[in-house]
C-alpha cells in the first residue's frame, strides 16, 4: 500500500510517478471549428492515445484520466449516448494495443450505472491486462471524489462494523479508496483553461502539483505533456516543510520508503 503524503514525505523524481488528467475542452474545440460536440469527443480519443504513449515512453508509472464524472449525467441525453458508444468503441479497439505494449488498464467509479454490456467489457479489459508490468492507465468513469470517500467509508464499516470512531484513520481508510493501488498523483493536469479540480480525486490530490493549460484536450500531445513535466521539475515540493529544510546538508525528512 502507498503511504499518504500527509503522513510521510513521498519519494519524488524529475518525472512524476503518477499523472492525473482532467481532459477538458472537447466541446469547445468542436464549437470553435463549427463542428458538433461529438466530433470533439471523437478527436479527444486520439489525444488519449497520444497521452498514454507519451506517459509510457517517459517512464510514468500511473496515468489516471477523468473520462466521465458523476455529474456528467446532467448533460444532454444525445451526448451521453454518444459518449457511452465511444467508450465501448475504445474498449473494443484499444485494449489489445494496450496489452501488446504491456500496459495495464483499470476503470474506477460507480460502474453500476453503466449498462451490463459495458460492465462486462470493462471486466474483460481489466482481466486481459491484469498481469502487465508496465504503465497502469486508470479510466475514471462515473467517478466523483466525494463518492470515492463515501464508498470507502461504507466499505470500511461493512468490513469492521464494530470499529471505534477513533480507529477510523487515514491508514484504516486508504485501502478502501478506489485508487488504493496507485501512489498519489504527483502532477495534476487540466486542459481547456478552467482552473478547478471538479470533484476529481479529492482525497488523493492533497499534495499534487496543479498544472492548468489553455489548450483544449483534442490538441493535447507529447509536446504539451513535456511542457507540463518541465513546469513540474521547477516546482519545490515541500510537503509542509520549509524551503530551508530542502537545502542539501539538512536533516533528512521521513520518507515513504523508510
From Swiss-Prot:
Entry binding sites for substrate: 25-29, 37, 41, 69-71, 73, 75, 190, 196-198
EC top class, as a word: transferase
Which keywords describe this protein according to UniProt? Magnesium, Metal-binding, Transferase
What does this protein's record comment on cofactor binding?
Answer: Binds 2 magnesium ions per subunit.
Is the keyword Transcription regulation in the record? Answer: no
For molecular function, the Gene Ontology terms on record are: ditrans,polycis-undecaprenyl-diphosphate synthase [(2E,6E)-farnesyl-diphosphate specific] activity; magnesium ion binding
Q: Which residues form the active site?
A: 24, 72 (proton acceptor)
Do you know which PROSITE patterns this protein is assigned to?
UPP_SYNTHASE
Keyword Transferase appears in the UniProt entry: yes
Q: What Enzyme Commission number(s) apply to this enzyme?
A: 2.5.1.-
Biological process annotations from GO: polyprenol biosynthetic process
Cofactor(s) annotated in UniProt: Mg(2+)
What's a Pfam family in this record? Prenyltransf
Positions annotated to bind Mg(2+): 24, 209
Q: Tell me, what does this protein do in biology?
A: Catalyzes the condensation of isopentenyl diphosphate (IPP) with allylic pyrophosphates generating different type of terpenoids.
Give the matching HAMAP family.
ISPT
The record's comment on protein family reads: Belongs to the UPP synthase family.
Q: Subunit composition? A: Homodimer.
Task: Write down what this protein is called.
Answer: Isoprenyl transferase
Amino acid at each position: 500500500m502507498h503511504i499518504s503524503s500527509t503522513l510521510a514525505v513521498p519519494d519524488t523524481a524529475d518525472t512524476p510517478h503518477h499523472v492525473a488528467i482532467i481532459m477538458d475542452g472537447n466541446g469547445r474545440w468542436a464549437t470553435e471549428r463549427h463542428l458538433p460536440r461529438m466530433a470533439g469527443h471523437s478527436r479527444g480519443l486520439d489525444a488519449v492515445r497520444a497521452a498514454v504513449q507519451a506517459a509510457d515512453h517517459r517512464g510514468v508509472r500511473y496515468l489516471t484520466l477523468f473520462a466521465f464524472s458523476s455529474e456528467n449525467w446532467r448533460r444532454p441525453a444525445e451526448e451521453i449516448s454518444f459518449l457511452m458508444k465511444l467508450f465501448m468503441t475504445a474498449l473494443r479497439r484499444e485494449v489489445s494495443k494496450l496489452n501488446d505494449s504491456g500496459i495495464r488498464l483499470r476503470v474506477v467509479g460507480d460502474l453500476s450505472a453503466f449498462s451490463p454490456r459495458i460492465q462486462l467489457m470493462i471486466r474483460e479489459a481489466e482481466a486481459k491486462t491484469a498481469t502487465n508490468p508496465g504503465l497502469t492507465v486508470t479510466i475514471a468513469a462515473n467517478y466523483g471524489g466525494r463518492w470515492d470517500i463515501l464508498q470507502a467509508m461504507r466499505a470500511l464499516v461493512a468490513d469492521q462494523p464494530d470499529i471505534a470512531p477513533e480507529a477510523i484513520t487515514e491508514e484504516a481508510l486508504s485501502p478502501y479508496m478506489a485508487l488504493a493501488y496507485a501512489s498519489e498523483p504527483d502532477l495534476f493536469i487540466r486542459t481547456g483553461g478552467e482552473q478547478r479540480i471538479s470533484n476529481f480525486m479529492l482525497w488523493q490530490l492533497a499534495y499534487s502539483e496543479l498544472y492548468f493549460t489553455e489548450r483544449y484536450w483534442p490538441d493535447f500531445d507529447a509536446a504539451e505533456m513535456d511542457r507540463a513535466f518541465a513546469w513540474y521539475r521547477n516546482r519545490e515540493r515541500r510537503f509542509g516543510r520549509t524551503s530551508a529544510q530542502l537545502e542539501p546538508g539538512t536533516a533528512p525528512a521521513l520518507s515513504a520508503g523508510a
